[in-house]
């Protein structure tokens, strides 16, 4: 069973645009390998952090919205935790509204 998730992560500011794109592709491929579907990627660009994280004041913000089984989240977060390029990440489960549930039931 798949659940809708949103993952937002921050990459180090000293990465080049090419390295940022490679990092995005790496995590997107990791999700696909774990059975994630409907992956939406939003590269929010370089932004100022509210406070210093790992001695960094800026970071590249990237957001994923996707459907995935629960085991995929543990694998994705483990990869991010071990990575030197990710300075912070957060995954939240999205609530499916009643309207969306009805729409899915009608189309099924």
Swiss-Prot record:
GO annotation, biological process: translation
Signal peptide extent: none
Pfam families: Ribosomal_S6
Molecular-function GO term, any one: structural constituent of ribosome
One Gene Ontology term, aspect cellular component: ribosome
Keywords: Ribonucleoprotein, Ribosomal protein, RNA-binding, rRNA-binding
InterPro entries on file: Ribosomal_bS6, Ribosomal_bS6_CS, Ribosomal_bS6_sf, Ribosomal_S6_plastid/chlpt, Transl_elong_EF1B/ribsomal_bS6
SUPFAM superfamilies for the chain: Ribosomal protein S6
Its biological purpose: Binds together with bS18 to 16S ribosomal RNA.
Family to which the UniProt record says this protein belongs: Belongs to the bacterial ribosomal protein bS6 family.
Protein's recorded name: Small ribosomal subunit protein bS6
Organism expressing this protein natively: Trichormus variabilis (strain ATCC 29413 / PCC 7937) (Anabaena variabilis)
């Amino acid at each position: 069973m798949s659940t809708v998730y949103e993952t937002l992560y921050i990459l180090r500011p000293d990465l080049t645009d090419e390295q940022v794109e490679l990092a995005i592709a790496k995590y997107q491929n990791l999700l696909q390998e774990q059975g994630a579907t409907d992956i939406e990627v939003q590269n929010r660009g370089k932004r100022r952090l509210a406070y210093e994280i790992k001695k960094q004041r800026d970071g590249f913000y990237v957001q994923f919205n996707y459907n995935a089984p629960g085991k995929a989240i543990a694998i994705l977060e483990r990869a991010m935790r071990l990575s030197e390029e990710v300075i912070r990440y957060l995954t939240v489960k999205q609530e499916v509204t009643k309207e969306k549930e009805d729409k899915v039931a009608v189309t099924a």
